């Protein structure tokens, strides 16, 4: 693919680099560094297309024997392609191809670094972190391709697990948390027979709980809230002989997430969590020891949460989520009317 969606400012910067007296290797490094700048905090999809173009230009400048930097350019293109909003299957397939071409080269150059620091010689050697990041991105791409029936979830999980060999909780807690979150969601998404349903959901719960042994609220609040919210979802729908206990644990997990998520600083995440908590409250008896007494109080609290979530989703243009919440709001109104 030759990128065509490059804005004029980036084209001008590419032209300046091309005409500069820098060496070809220096130009390649400048282009990839610029691309990484666009990828780190993209404001629009255009920033990601710019990153694709810059990596493509870097790849074109690489000589045939400059395999490591060709691989880095390919990995950079893939990272940008997978992050483009509403990305379709064709761009995901291209990202997959780029990563599958880059990974063997990164792994080979990593294998030759025994006794040598990749940080000392970045032009010659890949780092373990580079390889792990490529594995993590491959896992994300494969997971995104599963709904198109173009990849297997087991391959996605395998890629994540390879990345975890480097991204340990001691050194890379944020990546560790994200990888565990993605693995757990992958388990929840696997199409298994009904008798294996509880197994995959149980694996997801275990994966979230394992990550939360190391990801603490005080040190990594954002990742902590993400894991607690998704643990709540897994617990809420976990097939069990004691569903009431699971719902109570799910609500406790949502409450942990809400220690971080609030309507001012993280409105969409907050709305997501309170709507999840409302789902749990909807079916929770007011007095778990006397379920026959009903759950009017909890349904009223659920209604308040749904209403607040709907207002936030609508305000931020999240139409699909708003429609889901409206449907649940109508259901709870109907049930309250019967009480």
Regions found by a protein language model. Give the residues of each.
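Flexible inter-repeat linkers and adjacent short helices
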Residues: 1-93, 99, 105-114, 121-129, ...
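Short coil/turn connectors between adjacent alpha-helices in alpha-solenoid helical repeat scaffolds
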Residues: 2-5, 37-50, 81-97, 142-155, ...
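Inter-repeat boundary and helix-capping residues of tandem alpha-helical solenoids
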Residues: 6, 24, 28-31, 47-48, ...
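Flexible helix-coil transition and linker loops at the boundaries of alpha-helical arrays
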Residues: 16-25, 58-70, 102-131, 164-176, ...
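Conserved alpha-helical positions within TPR/SEL1-like repeat arrays
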Residues: 29-43, 69-85, 126-146, 174-189, ...
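Eukaryotic tandem repeat interaction scaffolds
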Residues: 174-286, 304
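TPR/TPR-like (Sel1-like) alpha-helical repeat modules
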Residues: 252-255, 294-317, 330
């Amino acid at each position: 693919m030759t990128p065509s969606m490059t804005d004029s400012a980036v084209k001008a910067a590419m032209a300046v680099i091309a005409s500069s007296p820098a060496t070809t290797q220096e130009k390649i490094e400048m282009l990839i560094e610029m691309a990484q700048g666009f990828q780190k905090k993209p404001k629009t999809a255009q920033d990601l297309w710019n990153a694709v173009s810059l990596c493509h230009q870097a790849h074109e400048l690489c000589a045939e024997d400059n395999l490591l930097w060709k691989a880095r350019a390919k990995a950079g293109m893939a990272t940008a392609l997978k992050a483009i909003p509403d990305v379709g299957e064709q761009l995901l397939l291209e990202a997959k191809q780029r990563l599958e071409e880059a990974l063997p080269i990164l792994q080979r150059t990593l294998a030759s670094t025994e006794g040598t620091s990749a940080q000392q010689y970045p032009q010659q050697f890949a780092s373990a972190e580079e390889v792990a990041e490529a594995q993590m991105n491959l896992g994300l791409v494969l997971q995104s391709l599963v709904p198109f029936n173009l990849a297997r979830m087991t391959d996605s999980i395998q890629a994540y697990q390879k990345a975890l060999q480097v991204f340990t909780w001691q050194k890379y807690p944020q990546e560790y948390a994200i990888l565990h979150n993605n693995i757990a969601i992958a388990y929840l998404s696997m199409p298994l027979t009904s008798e294996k349903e509880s197994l995959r959901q149980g694996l997801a719960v275990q994966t979230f709980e394992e990550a939360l042994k190391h990801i603490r609220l005080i040190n990594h609040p954002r990742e902590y809230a993400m894991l607690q919210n998704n643990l709540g979802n897994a617990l809420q729908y976990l097939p069990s002989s004691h569903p009431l206990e699971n719902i109570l644990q799910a609500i406790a997990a949502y409450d942990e997430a809400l220690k971080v998520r609030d309507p001012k600083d993280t409105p969409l995440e907050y709305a997501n969590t309170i709507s999840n908590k409302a789902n749990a409250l909807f079916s929770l008896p007011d007095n778990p020891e006397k379920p026959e007494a009903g759950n009017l109080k909890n349904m009223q609290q659920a209604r308040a949460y749904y209403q607040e979530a709907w207002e936030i989703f609508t305000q931020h243009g999240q139409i699909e989520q708003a429609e889901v919440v409206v449907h649940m709001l109508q259901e709870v109104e109907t049930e309250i009317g019967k009480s």
